[in-house]
Amino acid sequence: MHDRLLELVEENRRLSTSGVFSVAERLEIKQQQALEQMSAPSARDEIERVAGALQDHLECVRVDTDDWELLACGLKRIYRVGRRRFRALKKGADDDSVHRCRKAAKDLMYSLQSLTPMASGQIKRTVRQLHRLTDDLGEDHDLALLDSTLRDIGDRQQSKLRKAIKRRRAKLQRRARHAGRRLYERKPRRYLRHLGLRRNAWMVVHERLMRERPAPEGAAA
């Protein structure tokens, strides 16, 4: 949040630095307190316990990445959830709705990344667009937290800060809505058909290259 505050000041030169510095000091104190809580032995033990349990669970999971039907089923569900959330994202949406959209976009981004090396140029571009979208929504989330810190402070300087936050969040959310409409334009079934065609094209090229690869020296004729 401290970095977001500095970025906000950089974009809004008319904000008084004296008021901003007082807010920055409060944020640094809160951040330090949070770090101390995370560093406490009980917190570390809990993190290690959860991480260990998750690792044990993942080691039991074996997914055949060549099983397109299995991958397609998961991708379709992830895409459908994201499409529904972004289509419902309206101007002035509540923080929870924006956060759920960000989570859905990240799920799709990671899922598409798992398709490498078969990912086409278009899929890679989609991943980059999703990355920018999640960055925008991540900044919006940080600004929402910053705004909640300022909410109970009533002097003029903090009021100006909150107005600047509101303007920036409106811009970020507007950009996210437009990006979401483009990225989730297709219906889920059409989107999976689109991915399947690209996957099939990649498989044809891959198999041809494998057939044309020179045999290793000493291999049986």
Predicted regions and their residues:
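Function-determining surface determinants
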Residues: M1-A221
